[in-house]
Amino acid sequence: MPARSGGRQAAFPAILDPVRRMAHGCASSAWTIGFYALHNWMLALFDELAQEGAFATHPFLAPAPLAPTGRGVPTGGGVRLTGRWSWATG
């Protein structure tokens, strides 16, 4: 999460280190924590306006369907999403 939003703004290897260590004890927990970390890291790559909207409330839940089965079309005040998502993790 960006520092201006209360996060550590860590580099990606630093984000993955605790996940890797956790996996030695419980792979399921590491999988879950890894996805939560990945989702926030991906949002930190968006422009500042999108980040402000996402990180303004706590806790912020960020599911991330990584299979691109939908389509986003710009509209007057945002983006209209259409498609079918059979699963998402997070």
For the regions a language model picked out, list residue spans one by one.
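Glycine-rich flavin
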Residues: 1-90
